[in-house]
Amino acid sequence: MSFRSVLLTALLSLSFTTTMQAAHHHYHRYTDKLHRQNHKKDLISPKPTEQEACNTSSLSKELIPLSEQRGLLSPICDFISERPCLHGVSVRNLKQALKNSAGTQIALDWSILPQWFNPRVSHAPKLSIRDFGYSAHQTVTEATPPCWQNCFNPSAAVTIYDSSYGKGVFQISYTLVRYWRENAATAGDAMMLAGSINDYPSRQNIFSQFTFSQNFPNERVSLTIGQYSLYAIDGTLYNNDQQLGFISYALSQNPTATYSSGSLGAYLQVAPTASTSLQIGFQDAYNISGSSIKWSNLTKNRYNFHGFASWAPRCCLGSGQYSVLLYVTRQVPEQMEQTMGWSVNASQYISSKLYVFGRYSGVTGHVFPINRTYSFGMASANLFNRNPQDLFGIACAFNNVHLSASPNTKRKYETVIEGFAAIGCGPYLSFAPDFQLYLYPALRPNKQSARVYSVRANLAI
């Protein structure tokens, strides 16, 4: 037996041993947000117990079983008996009392994002005398910085029952986006970019989650029905949420995605082992925007399908997650082309302070200009042990632009480099200066770069 075989066997054994002894984490955008904001330490709150500080499970393992509650008003009585304001008003104590008495977790995220950009005017190429009468006239777009984005995202999870028959959890999440002055879509047109400068380039209302999940007693099988979005699982900790991590379109979500922002359907999730998770499901194909819940669409017999596999190992370096998402969308009036897409995500803690991640995604068809993307980056949370909200990140995305998706496309590729530094101010408020550098804008042949400067103020309760 060679030395390499022995070394490989030893490393695999060490990884397996560590895996069996440690908790595994499969990323879910809204569940993670609820868990993160319901485990914050308040400046005036009493010191949490050892069990609370060490618990890393999502949602409600430390909740009082709802089967012990008697009567409809018992949650209110239990909340009063918790006396959350006994030692002064504390957001953390109020949320902890609500969780213990009614099995409810709440997260409120409100961010204000001003963005300054350059160039400010789009470029119209000069036409030769042969072009007159034959080429379409290109309009010039001018935008005045800054564009101000106001984004509000409330989320909640309610454990309806927790008994020997399993656990029933209702989850809801809604995103409201408004702009003052210019919006990001106009700014992107002026800069002539294939990708937007943030995750929500225009005014939006998104019902991204409205689901009921039945977790069966063995905790390895769950069935979820209702309105949901694949954006919740397509990503890693910091490249899938504009309010927490990176801001640019290519680094805050899957820029090639053609699936819905929220649509009715169902999915079955199975966990063969503690470190693996498999999911298969379907959705109504008509509701692309997710702005409302459209029950009547379920009878139109057009559905999108997806399959998802996740592996969350824990080795001597730290925890990680590696996932693959495959999906198929149907042709509907709101999206006049059938597509098939994929997204491969990888993330790994190299140490307790260093987190690396990457994504490779693509899609068939010509629904959006970007049809392939390769991105990678790193982030460091609470590097100086000053505030848990401190976060530093830098990443790069290479976007392949389909020439036939837009008549003005001049380049096949567009690259964005982004860096930010989130600075926590207390347990709930943070400020994050952010810089985006776009190399070779896809729609602007006379310009080698474009720049975006942002300052994100985020209140996370």
From Swiss-Prot:
Organism listed in the record: Chlamydia trachomatis serovar A (strain ATCC VR-571B / DSM 19440 / HAR-13)
Signal peptide stretch: 1-22
The family this protein is said to belong to: Belongs to the OprB family.
* Gene Ontology terms: biological process: amino acid transport; carbohydrate transport; monoatomic ion transport
**This chain belongs to which protein, by name?**
Porin AaxA
Location within or outside the cell: Cell outer membrane
- Identify the InterPro entries for this entry: Carb-sel_porin_OprB (IPR007049), OprB_sf (IPR038673)
Q: Where mainly located? A: membrane
Domain of life, per UniProt, equals: Bacteria
Can you supply one Gene Ontology CC term for this chain's record? pore complex
Q: What does this protein do?
A: Facilitates L-arginine uptake, as part of the AaxABC system. The arginine uptake by the bacterium in the macrophage may be a virulence factor against the host innate immune response.
**Sorted UniProt keywords:** Amino-acid transport, Cell outer membrane, Ion transport, Membrane, Porin, Signal, Transmembrane, Transmembrane beta strand, Transport, Virulence
How does the protein associate with the membrane?
A: Multi-pass membrane protein
GO: which molecular function terms?
porin activity
